């Protein structure tokens, strides 16, 4: 979640995203051979496709898993699904789940080296959207201090 990051970490992340947005070709295939899994328990178009497109531009292999058509329909728990996917060796698992806190819970049980990204958990948080909104502000106002007396608080 965004709240788990320090202001410095968020600024570094936004600086990197800003650099990528200005010259995407310089970053193409910089993560070749790595794997990202989109684990989505909710219908999604923009968020899932955004993660997939970004990962593919970086040269990553992408696997999309949804609750529909998976063993979740037969009663498999979120944790069992996560452990099964984790055993396949992904570098990153992007999680979208309708229940609050599940992405954080999965991050706590993830093996070292497996990064869990919260792509939305119920009505509580949508960190990737918050970061996109912050990037949009950074692109429009490169110096946040010039936003007429308002200072975004990360």
Regions found by a protein language model. Name each.
Residues 5-8, 31, 42, 46, ...:
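Conserved active-site and cofactor/substrate-binding residues in soluble primary-metabolism enzymes
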Residues 22, 59-61, 138:
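Charged, amphipathic alpha-helical interaction segments
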Residues 1, 38, 64, 116-118:
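Structural signal for conserved beta-strand scaffold positions within catalytic alpha/beta enzyme cores
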Residues 1-53:
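Positively charged, low-complexity intrinsically disordered leader regions
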Residues 35-89:
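Active-site cofactor/substrate anionic-group-binding motifs, chiefly glycine-
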């Amino acid at each position: 979640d965004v709240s788990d990051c320090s202001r410095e970490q968020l600024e570094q992340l936004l600086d990197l995203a800003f650099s990528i947005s200005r010259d995407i070709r310089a970053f193409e295939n910089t993560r070749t051979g790595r794997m990202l899994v989109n684990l989505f328990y909710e219908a999604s178009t923009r968020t899932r496709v955004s993660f997939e497109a970004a990962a593919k531009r970086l040269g990553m292999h992408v696997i999309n898993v949804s609750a529909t058509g998976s063993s979740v329909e037969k009663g498999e728990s979120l944790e069992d699904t996560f452990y099964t996917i984790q055993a396949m060796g992904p570098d990153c698992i992007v999680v979208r789940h309708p229940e609050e806190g599940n992405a954080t819970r999965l991050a706590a049980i993830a093996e070292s080296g497996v990064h869990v990204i919260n792509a939305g958990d119920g009505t509580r948080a949508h960190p990737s959207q918050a970061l996109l909104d912050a990037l949009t502000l950074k692109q429009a106002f490169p110096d946040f201090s010039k936003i007429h007396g308002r200072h975004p608080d990360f």
